[in-house]
Amino acid sequence: MTIEEFIRTNHICQYPLHSFGINSVAYNHEDAIKIIGYARDNVIPILGGDWLYYKNNKIVLPIDYGDGWYCERKENESLKDYVYRSCSEAERAIRR
C-alpha cells in the first residue's frame, strides 16, 4: 500500500497549504502520528517538518515558520536505523 492509499484508506484529512504559497499539505496531530507509524512500518524516513496552528477555524503559520525540525541521515547509518531515528524524532517533535 502506498502512502497515498494509506491516507485514503484511513480517512486522513489533508489541509492544503497553497494559499500560503506552499506546495504541500498539513495533517492534524492524531493523523500525523498515524502517518509516522506507517512510515516506520514501511521503512520510509521522515526528513522533517514544520509546526502550524489552527486558530479561529484557520491554519496559521507561526512567525518563525520554516524553523521546524529536520533529520538527516548520518554517515554509515543504515537505512533501517535512519528510518527509526527519523520517525522517533518526528514523533517527539509532534508531541512537544
Task: Specify the residue positions occupied by each region the protein language model found.
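Long, contiguous N-terminal structural blocks used for assembly/anchoring
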Residues: 1-31, 38
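Short alpha-helical segments and helix-capping/turn motifs at coil-helix boundaries
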Residues: 30-34, 91-96
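Generic amphipathic, hydrophobic interface segment in small proteins and small subunits
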Residues: 34-45
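Acidic, low-complexity, intrinsically disordered interaction modules
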Residues: 43-95
